[in-house]
């Protein structure tokens, strides 16, 4: 049986109500969650059937892993207690356990309650490409209608965003606004709150507070550099008359600005920012340490850049000037809200006409079903009684819609078990809102200090995965960069990673340290034979790995717990874009005799070049498949631009894209060339096997040469040849 830490034991055993577990990287959170489930199933006083638990994970893969872990744990328990009928029953029920993603949960709920929602229960989910195309078509129709019915507010919006040019920016803003508000439980209500806020002025508004906070953070950053510069100059008599007066003046101005930002009115802040001036540094020709002078100048330049940014970006206008600007921009913003609502209506209608929905719809379907007038509905109360506990993993990556769903199903959080780590929130681009996790973290009390029934928190801060050298480096970095204004969390000892692994016999050995290897990519030039940045980084990484292997760098064997020389299989290279960069790293490693492989998520069919071939084969079979057809035309094989594709679509939006091509072939020579090649391939396919058709495609389009000329061309060519061989 594992030896649990006190905090892990609390997370496993606590039954006092809502519990938030802040689980640092490598803290054993999955093992803790699995053990908590097992303990609930086998509790002698209050056992729970597994189908009375709802376990929500972030991905399908995580849900499958959780089901497998729980099944394995139950299997081991049954093996140890073969006569325990209750355990055997739970093992039998594992396949019925509600271990799911939030979208799968919402999909199931929407299908069951389709009649209430007024939709068909057999609706389908659109994929990302179909959704993107449909949004573009709907947006175009909405803009056409808006131009036909334009009023002064709409023209004000156009003037603000288009400057008399094309309306691409207008469309981008409408779509961007629409997509962002989908993270709110009631997007329409949110927009109406924004509309109401436009009738008020003054900088004591959410927008004004954000501007002040941004300026405050920047001013603190710049002032810190001035403090360092003044400290460095103190005691150097040769520079007392040259540099110190100007820097002291800078520092005084920075502190006056900070005083205003922390305690003054808005106009006080603007006045302080506008009054900032920069005295000249007197030449110090006799001072010999020129590098030191450059360092001081760089610190001052940092402050000057910050001060200029504050004046130009955040503290740009007084309250009176802001009121004047509001009068000019409010009509445009009213029009933007109206346009977003119009797009929402049209997009919803288009999806319904196709009996389709997207992932945002699933979440909002659930909110509609689970809430009535802002309170949990009768359905929500009925469903909440089905679950003894709801456990949600990766809670830092939830948004407001998902949080509302979990609250409705958990009797307003009274039986909600949440696990996450705000430091690992990486899905802001998907509208995740880590502030939800932070608000709970700050408002929930420590378990030891909070009565049962009240929301509580426990921190799993010990890392059982890494050496002290790794953790110390991480803590050093994050303590420096994280704060209330960056990361929304002050990185104290409570949030830091603490050593939990006691199985490294080499712990404390000075040779185990964190290294930072820097590549100077400046001056690479434009020579075709010159290595690019990725190649240089790969070469340096390969060189360092070669050195580790040659010296027999000692590592701990996972099986024996003893030291042995490192092997290539012990080493992993983490890349932000492995699909594009991994081939370069593999080539550099193999060049110096190190065997390497890369795990390409999604496999061969997910690569851009092979995916294009699959789409082209599909189009040859049936050209009236808009998504595949447009994807092929945009690919390097045919090189149509987005503007060209849009012009073709404008021929007639009511027909398929292929039919639009047929109608426009005489007007666009590029379309005629494309259709001739497609017609040839369709004819060729009638009496030839697929492998010959594929090679004909390679030959007709020059695919191997085209993709070979792109970055990582050799790997792309290899992918195409592998696809052909299969």
Task: Map each language-model feature to its residues.
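Conserved helicase/translocase P-loop NTPase motor core
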Residues: 100-106, 335-389, 402, 538-561, ...
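Conserved ATP-dependent motor core of P-loop NTPases, especially the RecA-like helicase ATPase domain
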Residues: 16-18, 50, 54-61, 71-268, ...
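Accessory alpha-helical DNA-binding modules that contact the DNA backbone or grooves
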Residues: 651-681
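N-terminal accessory segments
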Residues: 1-27, 31-38, 45, 260-376, ...
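Conserved motor-region signature of P-loop NTPase helicases/translocases
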Residues: 1-56, 60-68, 72, 129, ...
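Core structural elements
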Residues: 94-107, 161-185, 336-341, 357-370, ...
């Amino acid at each position: 049986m594992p030896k649990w830490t006190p905090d892990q034991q609390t997370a496993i055993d606590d039954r006092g109500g809502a519990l938030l577990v802040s689980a640092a990287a490598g803290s054993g959170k999955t093992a803790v969650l699995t053990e908590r489930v097992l303990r609930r199933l086998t509790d002698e006083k209050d056992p729970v059937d597994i189908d009375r638990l709802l376990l929500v994970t972030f991905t399908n893969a995580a849900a499958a892993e959780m089901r497998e872990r729980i099944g394995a744990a139950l299997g081991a328990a049954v093996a140890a207690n073969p006569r325990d009928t209750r355990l055997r029953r739970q093992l039998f029920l594992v396949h019925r356990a509600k271990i799911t993603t939030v979208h799968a949960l919402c999909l199931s709920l929407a299908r069951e309650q389709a009649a209430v929602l007024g939709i068909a229960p057999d609706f389908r989910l659109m994929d990302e490409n179909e959704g993107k195309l449909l949004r573009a078509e709907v947006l175009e129709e909405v803009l056409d209608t808006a131009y036909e019915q334009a009023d002064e507010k709409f023209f004000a919006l156009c003037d603000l965003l288009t400057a008399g040019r094309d309306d691409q920016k207008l469309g981008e803003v409408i779509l961007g606004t629409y997509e962002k508000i989908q993270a709110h439980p009631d997007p329409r209500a949110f927009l109406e709150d924004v509309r109401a806020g436009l009738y008020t002025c003054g900088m004591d508004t959410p927008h004004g507070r954000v501007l002040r906070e941004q300026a405050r953070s920047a001013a603190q950053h710049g002032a810190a550099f001035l403090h360092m510069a003044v400290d460095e100059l103190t005691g150097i008599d040769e520079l007392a008359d040259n540099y110190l007066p100007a820097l002291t003046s800078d520092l005084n101005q920075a502190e006056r600005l900070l005083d205003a930002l922390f305690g003054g009115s808005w106009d006080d802040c603007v006045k302080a920012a506008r009054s900032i001036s920069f005295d000249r540094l007197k030449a110090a020709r006799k001072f010999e340490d020129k590098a030191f002078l450059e360092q001081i100048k760089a610190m001052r330049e940092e402050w000057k850049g910050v001060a200029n940014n504050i004046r130009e970006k955040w503290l740009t206008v007084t309250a009176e000037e802001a009121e004047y600007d509001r009068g000019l921009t409010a009509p445009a913003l009213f029009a933007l809200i109206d346009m977003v609502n119009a797009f929402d209506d049209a997009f919803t209608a288009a999806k319904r006409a196709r009996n389709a929905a997207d992932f945002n719809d699933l979440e909002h379907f659930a909110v509609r079903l689970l809430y009535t007038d802002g309170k949990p509905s009768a359905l929500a109360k009925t469903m909440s009684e089905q679950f003894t506990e709801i456990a949600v993993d990766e809670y830092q990556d939830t948004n407001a819609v998902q949080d509302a769903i979990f609250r409705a199903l958990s009797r307003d959080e009274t039986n909600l078990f949440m696990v996450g780590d705000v430091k690992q929130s990486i899905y802001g681009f998907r509208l995740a809102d880590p502030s939800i996790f932070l608000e709970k973290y700050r408002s929930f009390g420590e378990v030891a200090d909070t009565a049962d029934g009240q929301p509580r928190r426990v921190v799993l801060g010990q890392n059982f995965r890494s050496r002290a050298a790794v953790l110390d480096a991480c803590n050093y970095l994050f303590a420096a960069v994280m704060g209330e204004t960056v990361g929304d969390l002050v990185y104290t000892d409570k949030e830091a990673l603490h050593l939990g692994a006691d199985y490294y016999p080499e712990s404390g050995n000075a040779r185990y340290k964190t290294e930072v290897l820097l590549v100077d990519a400046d001056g690479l030039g434009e020579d075709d034979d010159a290595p690019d940045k990725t190649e240089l980084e790969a070469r340096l990484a390969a060189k360092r790995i070669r050195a580790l292997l040659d010296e027999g760098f000692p590592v701990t064997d996972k099986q024996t717990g003893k030291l042995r020389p490192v092997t290539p299989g012990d080493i992993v290279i983490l890349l932000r874009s492995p699909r594009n960069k991994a081939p370069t790293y593999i080539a550099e490693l193999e060049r110096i005799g190190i065997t390497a492989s890369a795990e390409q998520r999604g496999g061969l069919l997910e690569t851009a070049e092979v995916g294009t071939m699959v789409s082209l084969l599909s189009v040859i079979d049936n050209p009236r498949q808009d998504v595949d057809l447009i994807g092929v035309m945009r690919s390097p094989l045919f090189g149509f631009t987005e503007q060209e594709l849009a012009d073709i679509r404008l021929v007639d939006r009511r027909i398929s894209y292929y039919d639009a091509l047929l109608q426009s072939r005489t007007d666009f020579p590029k379309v005629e060339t494309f259709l001739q090649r497609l017609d040839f391939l369709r004819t060729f396919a009638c009496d030839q096997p697929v492998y010959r058709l594929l090679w004909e495609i390679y030959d007709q389009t020059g695919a191997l040469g085209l993709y070979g000329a792109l970055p990582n061309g050799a790997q792309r060519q290899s992918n195409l040849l592998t696809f052909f061989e299969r």
